[in-house]
Amino acid sequence: MDHFTKLVLRHRLILVTLIGFITLALGYYAWQVEIRTIFTDLQPANHPYVQTNDKYKKAFGGVNVVSIMVEVEQGDIFQLEVLETIQALQKGLQHIDAINQFQIISLASKKLKSVAATSEGFFAEPLMWPGIPRTQAEIDALRTATANNPMASGNFVSADLKAALVTVDFIDRLIDYDKVYPQLKALIANVQKPGMKISLVGQPVLAGIVIEHLPETFSIVIAIVVAILVILLLAKGTIRGMLLPLLSATISCAWALGIVHLLGVNLDPLAVVITFLISARAVSHAVQLILAFDAERAVNHDLSARDAARIALRKLFRPGLLGLATDAGAMAVVALTPIPLLQKAALIGALWLGAMVICTIILVPVLLSWTRVHHEHRILPFRMDPVFNGVLEACSGLATDKRHAATVVIIALTILVGSGFLAKDITIGDANPGSPILWPESAYNQNDASINERFPGSDRMFLVVAGKENDVLKNPGVLDNISRFQQYIEAQPEVGGTMSLADVIRPVNMLMREGNPRFYSVAYDQNFNAELLFLAMAGSDPGDVDRFTDYKFRNGAIQMNFRDHKGDTIRTAIQAIKDYAHLNPMEKASFELAGGLIGVLAAVNEVIFSGQLQSIALALLILFIFCAVAYRSPQAGLFFLPLVLLSNTITFAFMAWHGIGLNINTLPVAALGIGLGVDYAFYIADRVKERFEGGADLAESIHFALSRAGRGVIVTALTMVVSVILWFFLSSLRFQAEMGMLIALWMTVSAITALIVIPSMIHLFKPSFLVGSSTQNTHRQSNVLFMSR
């Protein structure tokens, strides 16, 4: 190690010049990194639900669905101005990018038809197309026709007639949320009239809102950087103590994001919080190196800056590299989850951590070697050392007193068991109705609640009926099974309503029987069902029944609406569908789960549920292996596990208590945080080992470690906790606020564990990889006692 550190500092000018050129080049590309949401990144591609969705979404509807509700303040929607607004929305949506022209459905579309039987035959005509009724008599007739139309009433016109719904599907492969959302907002603004409210919800709207808040996000980032600078300045009072941690974080960021751009990887807007999670590592390691440098200078005033930097690098290279390696290992585990968003997050994290080896662990000591230590200028006249010293003395007092140390370990064990018990209640998926990205009182979530109150639900899932031959969807057994399934699933409180090909056939069959409601059912003859479908589709346009069947009547879909997409809601509905399919098999067809937004979310939740415990176990295994190798002792692998377990169980328990679900948005933070803060313990442990091998007893070694490395732990934790808490107070996005709160909690628990629990464990258990064997330890204590005499 001495040879390596001397080599680094001997060629420091070449090294810094090379790093500078690389930073300029990669920084140029980092500035061009694409920040956008790609919905397919959220989908586990190999999951059967996602494969079903991808196979049938072009016909049956994908995940990018927007619902627009027109609600009147007075009277009902059957007023000329309101009907004009609905028609304007229907026409205006056709000009929005990536729209599926055949899947715009409203009262003003051709797809909602009124079927009538007269002495001259059957007539099927649109309820309100191509024109709208102008006279009061025509409007009254439309009201009556709508109320008697089972496809329109309740689904596209509310039961109280005070609201109308317009739904539209977007083509997944063409949609650009950055363009679509402003176009939707502009359309709403153009058709909005006094006396009515227009509500807008759906995945494209939600993604657009997140993108719209990017300027606010960048403003918060600037505020956080300023907060970090202030805290570092208060902690150290010097230019180098303030700027070097941020400089190392910035350079490593430029390297990582530059390479990410060159690889063609995008950065999701919600992943901005993750960048602070990773940046915390650079700040932490840089602060430890600066404090080690200052400590060497304080002990030996004649020591040159170059020698002090060399010693600091030599002493901290192992714990620093071990900390980065364990973090990288935890992120490598995340990459095993078959969700592109997590794989990209893991790639960014791994690249960033790899860059820190050079940009932090090596660069910071090199830059410190040029410091004019004899002419150090303090910007602030006062120091926070007395505060830090008081905290560290208290920690040392707890850890070096056997009774207190035992109490600390018992309390930590109790908290571990208790938080682990509470953590089991964490919700997989969304824990609350509405979008967890936004606050409950946000306009979007209020609109979503309003739509779900008046209509079957804004979130959709389709269940595929896959036939084994053409025209199977005309088979009476298949149609009867579909009808019975609809009755069964609509009885589930999670499902707001369903629609299928059977809903097209039933009203025509009733009309054939002079309107007798006894015949509101499918026919029991395949040819008769074919005739009923022919009558229903007479005069229809291409795509009118695409939501329910393909043109060969081989594969169909049962469309289901959900009033929320909570994890429990989705799991209960999926299980109910599986139970029905198992008990009601079909000879000529089968049910295939599941498409639409709910189907994709169900797939994500199942992947998270099956993989989260596995990810944590693998991350702990990696921590064990790395520690065992670094300290050449399996005991070391076990010793540091309590810190990681404690921080994780407390964080997950907090999520369960606070109603934060483990979903596709929170999982990257939760997964990347598995190994967060363990480097704190490495620095403490290495300093104990260093002092003990230098001849001190165990209590003095613990005191020394806390006074040196403990100061860095406090500064780093304080810096990151205060800064990320700004997300909570400044962000309009609930997700960012809650993730900031989670990171703050994670850092706090890790810091407390490293400062109190780990030293207490060292004092009680005297691990041999730090203090040698019990015989050596006894001999050491005897020597110290003899010398004291």
What are these regions (language model features)?
Residues M1-T37, V366, L380-N432, Q446, ...:
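Signature of alpha-helical transmembrane segments and their immediate interfacial
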Residues I231, L321-V364, L368, F624-C627, ...:
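Hydrophobic, glycine/alanine-rich multi-pass transmembrane helices and their short helix-loop junctions
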Residues K58, E84, W129-I239, D480-S483, ...:
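Extracytoplasmic
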Residues L18, E84, A88-V157, F170, ...:
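Alpha-helical transmembrane helix bundles of large polytopic membrane transport and channel proteins
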Residues E296-A325, R691-L718:
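Helix-loop junctions and hydrophobic alpha-helical segments within the transmembrane domains
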Residues L277-A298, G320, T326-D327, I362-L363, ...:
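Short helical (or helix-break) motifs at transmembrane helix termini and adjacent helical loops
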Residues E212, E216-V265, L336-P340, Q614-G659, ...:
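Interfacial segments of transmembrane alpha-helices in multi-pass membrane proteins
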Residues A399, H404-N527:
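Juxtamembrane segments of multi-pass membrane proteins
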